[in-house]
Amino acid sequence: MSRKYRKKLSRDDIRAVGFDFIEFLDDRETRSTTDRNTLKEIYNEQFRDRDGVRDPNFSSVLFALTRSSRTRVTRSEVFFDKKIRVRQNDQWSRPYRSQQNHATPHLNDAISRPSTTRVSDPSSVPEPENRVIARRRLAKTIMRQGNSEDMSVFFADKYGVRVSSELQIEDGKIHWCVEGAEVHELKLFVENTGQEAILFTCFSALHYLQYFTLDDSQRVRKDNPHRLEPNETYEVILRFKSDQIGVYPATLAFEFKENQDTRPFHIVRFIEAQHRSELTAQLGPTEPFRPKRLDTNQPMKWSIDEGFKPESSSQNFLKFVVPLDNYNCPSYTSALIEVLKGNRSSGKQLQEHQLTLESDLSFNNYMDRFDLLLYLEEDQMRMDIKRYNKKDVSMVRDRDKKLLVLELPGVSENRPSVLRGDHLLLTKSEELQNSNVTKYKGYVHRVELDQVKLGFSKRLLERFIDNMKFSVEFTINRLPLRLQHRAVHMVVQHHLKDVLFPVASRRLNPVSPSALRLFDQKLEKNPEQKTAVCNIVAGTSKPAPYLVFGPPGTGKTVTIVEAIKQVEKNTGGARILACAPSNSAADQLGEKLITSQHVDARNIYRIYASSRNPKEIPKVLENNSNVEGENIIFPCKEDLMPYKIVVCTLVTAGRLVSGGFPVGHFSHIFVDEAGHAVEPEIVISVAGLLNAETGQLVLAGDPKQLGPILRSPFAIKYGLGLSLLERLMTQNELYQKGDTGFDNRYVTKLLQNYRSHPSILKVPNELFYDNELKACADEISSRQYCTWEHLPKRGFPVIFHGVVGKDERESTSPSFFNTSEIDKIMDYLKKLLLTQAKKGIAKISPKDIGIIAPYRKQVEKIRQAIKIHRELKSLSGIEELKVGSVEEFQGQERKVIIVSTVRSSKEHIILDDKFNIGFLKNEKRFNVAVTRAKALLIMVGNPIILRTDEIWGRFMNYCIQERGYTGYDITHLEETDVIAERLLSLNIRQEITVETEESVVQQFLSPPWRHEH
C-alpha cells in the first residue's frame, strides 16, 4: 500500500492511534518516559507511518488523549494514565454470522496462488517488529484486500492450509460455550495438508482483546516463523476468562507464505465465546430462526355460513340520528401502496392522492388527507391481523351445547383483541384446497382467559365432531376507523378551522390572575397547575384549544380534574365531556371526580361501550354508569343530556354524535392522555359536538412521550402518528416557546415532578424538558433505596449494569431476545425480593416492580424465566410483577423499574433506526422507560452499543460520572481499536430474509390490539 494520508480522522480515530502508541511504548519498555520532546521523537521516527498509512501529528494525538482524561500534558512533560491497559482490550458488538463454511477450497477455485515475485509488502517484512505495529499492519492489509475480494476468501482454508478447532464451525464461526468463571481453553489447529512445506509467519487478534489471551509453544512471529511441514499440525491455544455472563467475540488472523519470496496469504477465524448460566441455556433459541411469509392466499370462491349471535347484553335507547357510513377502503388503496413503495408508476388519480399525502396538512385537504392515511393504516391492520391466523386447530363443545370452545393463547393480552360480539371465520382444514369453500362465521359469546366461546350455525353444530380440524381467520373491528372517517368529514361541515388551525384568541385583553379558590389545596402551592386551571375556566385560548403540557409525574390528570370541577362550579350552564383514548384513563378521570366529593356525584355519568365486560368496571363507578348488573344500557338522549359531566372514551364519544346530541351541548371538552391518540380519534369527540364559536377544547398530554401505535409505514411517514397535541405544539405559533416561556393563554407547562428521585429525573429533564422540571417527590418514598447495599454508589439509586450479550431470534418469530440480560435481571429480582427488609430497606411487593423491554420476545422470555426460576416462581404475588413493553407502561409508575435494552448487535441498529423500533434511535421510548421509576432505576444493556447513541451515551456517561455503573469492564472502552469497527464487515452474513406484508411494528414489537370502544 502506497503511503497516503488518511481520510479526515475523527477524535475517536486519533485517540485510538494514541492508545496504540502507548502500547508501543509499553512493548519497548519506554512508557515511563515523560519528556515531551523525547516522546515526540519516538513517535515520529519509530512509530508514525510504520503501517503504511499516514498517522496524525503528535500534537493531535496528545490533544485527543487529553480530552479523554487519559493523559496530562505540561509544556515539557507528558504523563500517561497508569490505568491504561495494553494488549487485552476491546469488545464490540456481536458480528454477523457468515454463511460460508470453512471447507478447504480447491486451488483452482476462486483463490489464486500468491505471487512468487519478491515484494516489499509491509505486512511481510521479516524483521523484528513491535506487536502493535504488526497487528495494525495485518489488520489493514486484510481490510485493504477485503475491499476488492469476496469476503469468503478470508474465511476459507487455502493452499493446503487448514485452520480448525476442537469445536464445529457453524455459519463461518466457532461457537464456544463456557460455564463458570475459571480459565477456559480452546485449541486451534493449524494443519498443512499439502505436499510442500509452508511458512507459518504469524497469528494475531485483529483488535484489542479483553478476556482472551493467545499462546503457542514456539512463539511464532514474523521474525520467528515456523516451517509447517506436510501433514504437520501446530497448536495455538486461545484462553478465555470472565465472571460476567455474556457473549464475547474475537477475530483472529493467521498469516502464511509459501516461501520468503511470495506474498503472504491469510486465513481469518471468528470466535464467539458465550459465557452462559443454566438459566441462559434454558432460555436459548428453541430452534433456528426461519422467517416465514404470511399466508395471504384466499380460495377462488367462498361463501359465508352465518353464525349464532350472542343475545344482546345491552339495551339501546340512544337512537341513531346521525348516520355512520362504512367508509370501506377504496379499490385503489393497494395500487397507491405500490406507488408509494416505488414498485409502479402512477396514473393521474394516484398522482393526486400521492400529492395530497406529501402536502402539508391544511384545513383544505384535511378530510382527503386523513381519509387516505386511515385507508393506508387499515390496509396494514388487515395484513397484520393475519399473523394470528391458525391452521389445523381443533375445538371442543362447551357445556352449553350451542357453543364451541377455541383455545387462543395471547387473547387475554389483546394479541389479538377479541370482544363479545366480534366474529372469527373458520374453514374446515380438509376443504382448504377446494376451489369453493365455506367459511363458518363464529360470533364471540364469551372470552375467558385464553379461551373464546363461539356461536356457529346449526349446520356446523350438527356435523361437528370434537377435535375436528379448522383454519382460523381473524378480522379487525372497523368501528373506530369508521368513526374517525366520519369525524374528519364533519370537521369541514361544522367549520372547525379555528379549533384545529387556530390563529389567535378572540379575547382582546389578557385575563388578570383569577381569584379562584381551588378544591385541591396542593394545587394552590403549584403556580403552573393553578395557572392552567384559572385560564381554562376563563377561556383565555378560545376558540383555540388550551393545552396542558404535562411531563412525567407532574400531575396533569389532577390538573384536568381540578379544572373540570372548577368549570362545573363557576361556569353557568356548563356541560362537560371528559374523554381519554383508553378505558383505564377514562375510569381514572371518573374515579377522581366522584371520590373528590366536590361535585355532586349525581351529575357525573360514565358511559361504557356495549363490548365492555361489566365485571371489569370499577366498583366506585357502577352507580354512575350505564352498567346494570351484567348488562350495558344506553339511555336515551333525553336522559343523558341533563348530566353536567359525561365521561367516556374517545371512540364512545362517537356514539353521542350518532345519538344526535346537538352541537354546542357540551360547552367544554377535555381530553386526557391526548398524546396517545391519532388526530382523527381526538376529532371524534369534537366534530358534531363542539361549537367552534363558543366551546372550549382542552388537551392534556406530553408530546415528548410516545404517541399512538401505528402499523402502516406510510401512515407513519405522512403524519398519522402525529397527535393533535404534538402538531399544535410543534407547528402552530400560538403554542411555541418564546424567550419568556410559553404563552399561558394557550398552553401551560407543568414543572413540579411528584414521582421520581432527583437522580432518576436528571437526564430526561435535561434532554427533553429544558432542565425546568423540579424534583418534588415525597422524600421518604423516593429515597427508599438510597441505602440499598447493592447500589454501586450509596445515595445514587440509578444502576447501569453493562452486559455484553447477544440479540437472538428463534423459530418463525422475528422479534429479538437477549438471555444474558435476562440472567442479570433475575439476579436483581432475587436481590430485591428475596433479601429485602434488611438494613433499613422496606419490604417491597412484586407489584411495585416493573420490567420494561422493547421487544415482545424479550418480554415473553423474561416471563418464562420467572416461571422456571427455582426461588422466584413460588414467591407470593409474583404474578403481579408486570413485564411489558414501553407502550404498556406509559402513564404508569413503579417504585422500581428494571429496563432490558436487548440490543447487542450493531447490524440490527440499522433496522431500529430505519423503522423507529427498540430503544436506540427512539428518544421518546427512552424517555418513557426512564421516567416510570420512583425510587430505583436499573438499566441492563450493552455499553459498547449504547454509547454509540447520543441519548443513551449521555445517560451512560451520567451513570459513569456518578459511579452508578457496574458490570462489564468499560475502564478501557475508549481504547477500542478503530479497525475493529471495520472488521465487522468481514463477518457480515446476509440473514435469510422473506418478503412479508406484515408490518415491522407487528413483527418486532407485536403490540396489543386496541379494543377501546
Curated annotation (Swiss-Prot):
UniProt lists compositionally biased (Polar residues) regions at 91-103, 113-123
- SUPFAM superfamilies from the xrefs? P-loop containing nucleoside triphosphate hydrolases
Alphabetized Pfam families for the sequence: AAA_11, AAA_12, MOV-10_beta-barrel, Mov-10_helical, MOV-10_Ig-like, MOV-10_N
Biological process annotations from GO: miRNA-mediated gene silencing by mRNA destabilization; regulatory ncRNA-mediated post-transcriptional gene silencing
Residues that hold ATP according to the record: G550, P551, P552, G553, T554, G555, K556, T557
Which Gene3D superfamilies does the protein's record reference?
A: P-loop containing nucleotide triphosphate hydrolases
Give the catalysed reaction(s), semicolon-separated: ATP + H2O = ADP + phosphate + H(+)
| InterPro entries given in the database record | AAA+_ATPase, DNA2/NAM7-like_C, DNA2/NAM7_AAA_11, MOV-10-like_beta-barrel, MOV-10/SDE3_DEXXQ/H-box, Mov-10_helical, MOV-10_Ig-like, MOV-10_N
Has keyword Methyltransferase?
A: no
Q: Where does the chain cross the membrane?
A: none
What GO terms are given for molecular function? 5'-3' RNA helicase activity; ATP binding; ATP hydrolysis activity; RNA binding
Q: State which Enzyme Commission number(s) the record gives.
A: 3.6.4.13
Q: Where is this motif: DEAG box?
A: 672-675
Q: Please provide the record's keywords in A-Z order.
A: ATP-binding, Cytoplasm, Helicase, Hydrolase, Nucleotide-binding, RNA-binding, RNA-mediated gene silencing
Which compartments is it annotated to reside in? Answer: Cytoplasm, P-body
User: Which residue intervals make up region (Disordered)?
Assistant: 91-129
One GO cellular component from the entry? Answer: P-body
Family, according to the entry, reads as follows: Belongs to the DNA2/NAM7 helicase family. SDE3 subfamily.
Known role: Probable RNA helicase. Required for RNA-mediated gene silencing by the RNA-induced silencing complex (RISC). Required for both miRNA-mediated translational repression and miRNA-mediated cleavage of complementary mRNAs by RISC.
- The name of this protein is Putative helicase mov-10-B.1
